[in-house]
UniProtKB/Swiss-Prot annotation:
Catalysed reactions listed for this entry: RNA(n) + a ribonucleoside 5'-triphosphate = RNA(n+1) + diphosphate
The entry's keywords: Chloroplast, DNA-directed RNA polymerase, Nucleotidyltransferase, Plastid, Transcription, Transferase
GO biological process, one term: DNA-templated transcription
Cystine connections: none
Protein task: DNA-dependent RNA polymerase catalyzes the transcription of DNA into RNA using the four ribonucleoside triphosphates as substrates.
Record-listed E.C. numbers: 2.7.7.6
InterPro entries attached to this UniProt entry: DNA-dir_RNA_pol_bsu_ext_1_sf (IPR042107), DNA-dir_RNA_pol_su2 (IPR015712), DNA-dir_RNAP_su2_dom (IPR007120), DNA-dir_RNAP_su2_hyb_sf (IPR037033), RNA_pol_bsu_bac (IPR010243), RNA_pol_bsu_CS (IPR007121), RNA_pol_Rpb2_2 (IPR007642), RNA_pol_Rpb2_2_sf (IPR037034)
Organism: Jasminum nudiflorum (Winter jasmine)
Subunit-level organization: In plastids the minimal PEP RNA polymerase catalytic core is composed of four subunits: alpha, beta, beta', and beta''. When a (nuclear-encoded) sigma factor is associated with the core the holoenzyme is formed, which can initiate transcription.
Keyword Transcription: yes
Any one GO molecular-function label of the UniProt entry: DNA binding
Family under the similarity heading: Belongs to the RNA polymerase beta chain family.
SUPFAM superfamilies assigned to the protein according to its UniProt record, in alphabetical order: beta and beta-prime subunits of DNA dependent RNA-polymerase
Protein known as: DNA-directed RNA polymerase subunit beta
Length: 1064
């Protein structure tokens, strides 16, 4: 895939494969497993029995298409039918019927679900795998304390600990612990069975005293003792069935259910052979765990690494959907039981059918609630195609049953050797969740037991062929695995003596004959985002992390351009993202236009609809452009249309622009960027953004273009229905939808007189029009008037879509692919920009001080190689870690290409041996050359979604908080500028007393002074100085009064300096 020279390399699997496999596993296995748990339901008289037959169920093809579901804000789902039976025991008759129990949201070709018209995706969660784990900690006396933690399938934890006297305790809470003999007896074992099933019975007998022997004399005594400790109940409780039931519900069901994975882990760790279908904790498990704990105490066992991936499990979309189905079936069971056992059954006049007992509400509402509110169900990030595909490969330690950002330790966040080839060590979030949210490696997949697996090539002397195996984290630590960037991986130099390899979480240097497996790709252990960074091996990991995140923030441009220097993954990322239109079979193009492509094949004519100016969840523009011509024959899999941020079927997030690394009058200090006006006038970095504005009408509200008290020019864009016309240009404050809401009118003599004379009831309406908010301007490209089917009382929804064209401007954020980011500080005329020796002015000027301290030298290689590629009209696809072929391979490649470009273009300044990669350039203002040679090149620069149009904000008059009377905070609320301590110090330092007084009084919380300003300003008078305390000070006084503290304050008069007492 990546070139003929990369022999033995594997093609990369579908990047959406994890989501697809999870959903298919839910359909194939999860539905059957949950239906098999549905019990038979009988009425109170045991005359009627209801049951579901798990063998016969079906999912019906959706009634509507994906596009219609998005357009109408509905759920793209399939009806779930199950065969059910209603048995009358007295007559032995059974009515069997296929019933509808609800709708299940389906997964589309992008690996996402459409719920209420919104694309949503379920991310993977990493949890501690159920089983038992042994660890050692030091107590306050610096003595090692050994514990064994049993984790249930639901996340509940119980601990076994051994003290100095080798007594073993089971801790059921933080404060309460009981003897392991009492726990085993409460679970049904007597003393003889306990001693027969342990390896060290003498240790168990050593702490068995008379009092302890009485507690385990019978199962009832053990249960009473256990209940007294577990429930913290005083006195002498009496044994009863209700006590056993409560103990079963609160302890054994929550903390002792191991599940399928937990039973497998428990058998492996404790060397047991308990059947897999026995998923609950048994006395045999407890006793075996105690034996291993004794061995740990005396140094005969090995402790567990809780952060090793073999001790983790992946909770994928299949597990989450199956859990929700189980929850919905429990609710359905309660509903059916209430119907059968309720008083309404005596009123049945005819024989009921199974469908009469079941409604689709429990299943449908459960899934809609899950997709709408569960933390692991997120709105799909559609900023660009890369973002969409990376979002489905995310994993998280957080959310239900997991960790929190404030309590997670550094050890959990850190990189672990078992992450090799499974979890990307680079790509993670920044901030408080660093190390807790990340991306899967490019080849990782989820195994049958919920573990992350990675592929490796097996090296065997018996077979000459290459065999690829997927290894789980527990298996590969028993083998030596050679790294993918090793020199000895090339077949020509396999006689190297030693190679770097990994064995048992250690990185060693061993002989090639001792290697069992080797990696299949050099970037196998990176995520998609990190694999798109060229020369990543020359960058610091922190900057690579930033680049992985910033590539997902790149805005699709109106004229995209594929990168000169890439890694080779750009085509597959674009293909798997769903942004392209692909031919599903061979045929011939009949016609093409902006809306659809018609092509004929096998006697049929197919129509492929194209995406036209569709708004994404991030307000970016999604649009497809045909790439085939009429009459052209196409093959299966050929690209028919490019999407947003794709060119020729490859990912294209930015532009190749001419860049110089030099200081320029201080305008590019501190990561600021200087750009040429060419980028503005030639629409180099112009992007389109589509915003959605909507309004609902219900009841007596009406949409109209006749709005009283509004001037005609404000309604000029409305049609006869009161909705803005397509193609209209609208500015801030423009009316998009005219709407009137009736108000209740108080009865008055004047209104009664009008009614008596004219016979018309006086009514008033309130103006509730939809207006374009601050910052909104553009062209109306779509209007949708939607009403839900089947009910006229449902509120109507009107959506207005406005397209906004944004050129690059001062305040926008740009970034490269190496973590080199900056804000546009100044736009210079092209004649003032520094220019090359051939007269071309540069497009951007970066600060050279941003390279050495941040150690992202990869941008220098990309910059120089891009210059050579631009002159030679070549595109390069560089696989990371190219030094595995030759030392200094990156430097040699760049210099050789620059030398060839210099020869072919007859421009010796392209490659000058004295300072290769640099050139003498000239100041555009004076024409004089700069003193030092300057690095110039053509890197790939992205325009990010952090744009000044979304951030800039101004306020003159707005809302205030009720308590402190200070302006609100934030742009969304129309808030004011915040002035804190440091801002006050800065103003004090410059001695601007009047500005400081305005900030703290008139513009803040001084109510009386604030009210005098408008009138004083209109008549041109002098604004009086405030003479009383501001409102925040009054709040402080009232707070102190609530604590029974009286605070009196005094104001000094400027005229006579006499002290006057003022009450707050």
């Amino acid at each position: 895939m990546l070139g003929d020279g990369n022999e033995g390399m594997s093609t990369i699997p579908g990047l959406n494969q994890i989501q697809f496999e999870g959903f298919c596993r839910f359909i194939d296995q999860g539905l059957t497993e949950e239906l098999s748990k549905f019990p038979k339901i009988e009425d109170t008289d045991q005359e009627i029995e209801f049951q579901l037959f798990m063998e016969r169920y079906q999912l019906v093809e959706p009634l509507r298409k994906e596009r219609d579901a998005v357009y109408e804000s509905l759920t793209y789902s399939s009806e779930f039918y199950v065969s059910a039976g209603l048995i009358w025991k007295t007559s032995r008759d059974m009515q069997e019927q296929t019933i509808l129990i609800g709708n299940i949201p389906l997964m589309n070709s992008l690996g996402t679900s459409i719920v209420k018209g919104i694309y949503r995706i379920v991310i993977n969660q990493i949890l501690q795998s159920p089983g038992i784990y042994y660890r050692s900690e030091l107590d306050h006396n610096e003595i090692s304390v050994y514990t064994g933690t049993i984790i249930s399938d639901w996340g509940g934890r119980s601990e076994l600990e051994i003290d100095r006297k080798a007594r073993i305790w089971a801790r059921v809470s933080r404060k309460q612990k009981i003897s392991i003999l009492v726990l085993s007896s409460a679970m049904g074992s007597n003393l003889k069975e306990i001693l027969d099933n342990v390896f060290y019975p003498e240790i168990f007998l050593s702490f068995l005293k008379d009092k302890e022997r009485k507690k385990i004399g019978s199962k009832e005594n053990a249960i009473l003792e256990f209940y007294q400790q577990f429930a913290c109940v005083g006195g002498d409780p009496v044994f009863s069935e209700s006590l056993c039931k409560e103990l079963q519900t609160k302890f054994f069901q929550q903390r002792c259910e191991l599940g399928r994975i937990g039973r497998r882990n428990m058998n492996r760790r404790l060397n047991l052979d308990i059947p897999q279908n026995n998923t609950f904790l048994l006395p045999r498990d407890i006793l075996a765990a105690a034996d291993h704990l004794i061995e740990q105490k005396f140094g005969m066992g090995t402790l567990d690494d809780m952060n090793h991936l073999k001790n983790k499990r992946i909770r994928s979309v299949a597990d989450l959907l199956q859990d929700q189905l189980g929850l919905a079936l429990v609710r359905l069971e309660d509903e059916v039981r209430e119907t059968i056992c309720g008083p309404i059954r005596h009123k049945w006049r005819t024989t009921p059918h199974p469908q009469n007992l079941v409604t689709s509400t429990p299943l449908t509402t459960t899934y809609e609630s899950f997709f709408g509110s569960h933390p692991l169900s997120q709105v799909l990030d559609q900023t660009n195609p890369l973002t969409q595909i990376v979002h489905g490969r995310k994993w998280s330690y957080l959310d239900p049953g997991g960790l929190t950002g404030r309590t997670a330790s550094f050890r959990i966040r850190d990189i672990h050797p078992s992450h090799y080839g499974r979890i990307c060590p680079i790509d993670t979030s920044e901030g408080i969740n660093v190390g807790l949210i990340g991306s899967l490696a490019i080849h990782a997949k989820i195994g049958h037991w919920g573990s992350l697996e990675s592929p490796f090539y097996e090296i065997s002397e018996r077979s000459t062929g290459v065999q690829m195996l997927y290894l789980s984290p527990g298996r590969d630590e028993y083998y030596t695995v050679a790294a993918g960037n090793s020199l000895a991986l090339n077949q020509d130099i396999q006689e190297e003596e030693v190679v770097p390899a990994r064995y048992r979480q250690e990185f060693l240097t061993i002989a090639w004959e001792q290697v069992h497996f080797r990696s299949i790709l050099p970037f196998q252990y990176f995520s998609i985002g990190a694999s798109l960074i060229p020369f990543i091996e020359h960058n610091d990991a922190n900057r690579a992390l930033m680049s992985s995140n910033m590539q997902r923030q790149a805005v699709p441009l109106s004229r995209p351009e594929k990168c000169i220097v890439g890694t080779g993954l750009e085509r597959q990322v674009a293909l798997d993202s769903g942004a392209l239109a692909i031919a599903e079979r061979e045929g011939k193009i009949v016609s093409t236009d902006t809306e659809k492509i018609l092509f004929s094949g096998n006697g049929d004519t197919l129509s492929i609809p194209l995406v036209m100016y569709q708004s994404s969840n991030k307000n970016t523009c999604m649009h497809q452009k045909p790439q085939v011509q009429r009459g052209k024959c196409i093959k299966k899999g050929q690209i028919l249309a490019d999407g947003a941020a794709t060119v020729g079927g490859e990912l294209a997030l930015g532009k190749n622009v001419l860049v110089a690394y030099m200081p320029w009058e201080g305008y590019n200090s501190e990561d600021a960027v200087l750009i040429s006006e060419r980028l503005v006038y030639e629409d180099i970095y112009t992007s389109f953004h589509i915003r959605k504005y909507e309004i609902q009408t219900a009841g007596t509200e009406r949409i109209t273009n006749e709005i009283p008290h509004l001037e005609a020019h404000l309604l000029r864009n409305l049609d006869k229905n009161g909705i803005v016309m397509l193609g209209s240009w609208v500015e801030t404050g423009a009316i998009l939808v005219g709407k009137l809401t009736p108000e209740v009118v108080k009865e008055s003599p004047a209104n009664r007189l009008v009614y008596d004379i004219v016979g018309i009831q006086v009514s008033t309406s309130k103006d509730t029009c939809l207006k374009l908010p601050i910052g909104g301007r553009g062209r109306v490209i779509d209007v949708r008037w939607i009403q839900k089917r089947g009910d006229n009382d449902n509120p109507e929804t009107i959506r207005i879509y406005i397209s906004q064209k944004r050129e690059i401007k001062v305040g926008d954020k740009v970034a490269g692919r190496h973590g080199n980011k900056g804000i546009i500080s100044k736009i210079l005329p092209r004649q003032d920009m520094p220019y090359l020796q051939d007269g071309r002015p540069v497009d951007m000027v970066f600060n050279p001080l941003g390279v050495p301290s941040r150690m992202n030298v990869g941008q220098i290689f990309e910059c120089s190689l891009g210059l050579a590629g631009g002159l030679l009209d070549r595109h390069y696809r560089i696989v990371p870690f190219d030094e595995r072929y030759e030392q200094e391979a990156s430097r040699k490649l760049v210099f050789s290409e620059l030398y060839e470009a210099s020869k072919q273009t007859t421009n010796p300044w392209v490659f000058e041996p004295e300072y290769p990669g640099k050139s003498r350039i000239f100041d555009g203002r004076s024409g004089n050359p700069f003193e030092q040679p300057i690095l110039i090149g053509k890197p790939y620069i992205l325009k990010l979604i952090h744009q000044v149009d979304d951030k800039i904000h101004g306020r003159s008059v707005g809302n205030y908080t009720h308590i402190t009377q200070q302006p609100l905070r934030g742009r969304a609320k129309g808030g004011g500028q915040r002035v804190g301590e440091m801002e006050v110090w800065a103003l004090e330092g410059f001695g601007v007393a009047h500005i400081l007084q305005e900030m703290l009084t008139y513009k803040s919380d001084h109510i009386r002074a604030r009210q005098k300003i408008p009138g004083t300003t209109m008549i041109g008078g002098t604004i009086p100085n405030p003479e009383d305390a501001p409102e925040s000070f009054r709040v402080l006084v009232r707070e102190l009064r609530s604590l029974a503290l009286e605070l009196n304050h005094f104001l000094v008069s400027e005229k006579n300096f006499q002290i006057n007492r003022k009450e707050a």
